[in-house]
Amino acid sequence: MKLNHDQLEIDFPHWLNWAREIQAISQTGLHFAENDYQTQRFQRLSEISAEILGNYTNLDSADLVEIFADQIGYATPRIDVRGAAFRDGSLLLVRERIDGGWTMPGGWADVGDFPSAAVEREVLEEAGFKVEARKVIGIYDANRTGPLEIFHAFKIVFLCEIISGEPRPSFETSEVAFFSHDEIPQVLSGERTRQRHIHDAFVALSEDRPTIFD
């Protein structure tokens, strides 16, 4: 769940870090709880996290408690994969139906996937191109320069080689197109792709440099 900018009441949200950490402690604690007392205490921590978020946003605390209840097991950051695929020096982007913004194709990695297999599948599903992942361009903290979200996530951007295929939108994407560096659309799907990721992708295409990481 994304926290829209108009939901934020302060510029530097220490409260978001606190709420995330409390929720992570709660989720992990519930996973290892050995008795009803521990379960109740860790459930209360989840409620406190929801109350913090509800106080600083227009999100409903009760809805957040339900969302948190669906998160089970040891709490870790989520993994988002993105494929930077080029044709004649232009970058493949897809337009998201959900917000109308452009992004490199990708999505959450599924359990059981190799990271490379995840990004190759996402590019095929969202854009219609069979690709092979060749290199990790960067590993980013997804919220460092993007919209704030409740759950912490890492973003892995791969340099991919197009093997075959033609542009083909999906139920998630409305358009598929290639853009030179100077033609990149101004309206990006910010929680998925940022200008930083696009810049690094073009650099990786032209230069042999080490993987970038936060």
Predicted regions and their residues:
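Nudix hydrolase/Nudix homology domain
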Residues: 1-42, 101, 171-214
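General structural signal for alpha-helix termini and helix-helix connectors
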Residues: 28-32, 70, 142
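Acidic, metal-coordinating catalytic segment for phosphate/diphosphate chemistry
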Residues: 37-82
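N-terminal strand-loop-strand
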Residues: 65-103, 131, 135
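Short acidic, glycine/proline-rich loop/turn micro-motifs
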Residues: 105-107
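Unchanged
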Residues: 109-133, 141-197, 206-214
